[in-house]
Amino acid sequence: MAGKRRKKGRSHSTRPATPTVPKWIQYDPEEIEEIIVDLARKGYGPSMIGIILRDQFGIPLVKPILGKSITEVLEERGIKMVVPEDLFRLIEKAVNLRRHLEEHPKDTHAKKGLLDLESKIRRLAEYYKRVGKLPRDWKYDPQQAKLLVAGGLYREEKPAS
């Protein structure tokens, strides 16, 4: 009998069982790092960068090759995420939903969706404050969220030398 969450076929890729460096990779670690930085500068998030590396460059996982994650590579190069990517995507969704509600104020389902979404944002923010990925005084504010989303996922700083 199938599990509760997965009914019928759900398409997904399987991660390699043992994360080793595949023989078919034609790129050396420096080239892979350059590709990652270029994609980040184009505005792609770490998850999308991973998908592009897998689908277009034939690189299944970055960590076995470089010994560090995509986010760590970007931070070494001075490209830092404003907030963690999953939180940023939720905030982006909330901003778009608020814009929708300005045009359609009677959409009660969207209002409920916004309440649920903002609750999820606050819960996730609490977690990130607890583990130290967000400052203790960080607070979700819908007006600030618009500015955060408009500014993008990354801030470029001077690389640590």
Swiss-Prot record:
According to the record, the residues making up region (Disordered) are 1-22
Question: Which Gene3D superfamilies has this protein been placed in?
Answer: 4.10.860.130, S15/NS1, RNA-binding
SUPFAM superfamilies with a match to the protein in the record: S15/NS1 RNA-binding domain (SSF47060)
PROSITE patterns attached to this UniProt entry: RIBOSOMAL_S15
Q: Which InterPro entries match?
A: Ribosomal_uS15 (IPR000589), Ribosomal_uS15_arc_euk (IPR023029), Ribosomal_uS15_N (IPR012606), uS15_NS1_RNA-bd_sf (IPR009068)
Taken from the UniProt entry, a GO cellular component term is: cytosolic small ribosomal subunit
Please list the GO terms describing molecular function: small ribosomal subunit rRNA binding; structural constituent of ribosome
Q: Where is the composition biased (Basic residues)?
A: 1-13
The entry's keywords: Ribonucleoprotein, Ribosomal protein
What CDD domains does its record include?
Ribosomal_S15p_S13e
Record carries keyword Nucleotide-binding: no
Quick one: a GO biological-process term for this protein? Answer: translation
What the entry lists under HAMAP family is as follows: Ribosomal_uS15_A
Give the family per the record.
Belongs to the universal ribosomal protein uS15 family.
The name this protein goes by in its record: Small ribosomal subunit protein uS15
Q: Which organism is it from?
A: Hyperthermus butylicus (strain DSM 5456 / JCM 9403 / PLM1-5)
